[in-house]
Amino acid sequence: METLICIPMIFLSEMGAYAWHRWGSHTDVLPGAKRTHDIHHAIVDDKAEGDFMYVILLLFLYFNILLILYLYTYITALMFFSMYFPVILIFFWNFYVHTAYHIENHWLNRYEWFRNDKRIHMHHHTDPTKNFGIATHYTDLLLDTFSSAFPVNSISNV
């Protein structure tokens, strides 16, 4: 049973990342989040890796909230980790891939899928109403915010 929980948790984690990016980072639901994210959007080259660190604070808060919920419920430890682990994995994968998009000679640049995703991400920098997904794009496809059109000069050294 607990193993089956991982699959929807992966889906829900991606949906949560999409929701945060679309409505948390692009609005001021958390004071200062939009301003910080706007700085990130102003950078259309691949040297923006240092401006994404505020997410670590959000991660810390989120996981502590999950821990508190766990302590005050009757969820088994196995079930808790089957929900908690996929969320951690998705977050860190998104964080790693997003940071890699902004490192000029990152080792992932040797892969076509990564270079393509990097272009899609950089399109979001020039059109912040499209491509909110970071490491996957199914949320954008589901919510009609995906665009495969790449603006000219959207990124250097792809």
Q: Positions of the model-derived regions?
A:
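Short membrane-interface loop/juxtamembrane segments of multi-pass integral membrane proteins
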Residues: 36-48, 119-127
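Divalent metal-coordination and catalytic microenvironments
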Residues: 21, 37, 98, 121, ...
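Hydrophobic alpha-helical transmembrane segments
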Residues: 1-13, 26-33, 81
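Helix-coil boundary and interhelical linker segments in multi-pass alpha-helical membrane proteins
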Residues: 1-6, 67-83
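Membrane-interface helix-loop junction between the first two transmembrane segments
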Residues: 19-43
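Core segments of transmembrane alpha-helices
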Residues: 51-72, 137
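Transmembrane alpha-helical segments that form the membrane-embedded catalytic/substrate-channel core
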Residues: 11-25, 84-104
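Membrane-proximal soluble regions of multi-pass membrane proteins
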Residues: 27-32, 103-158
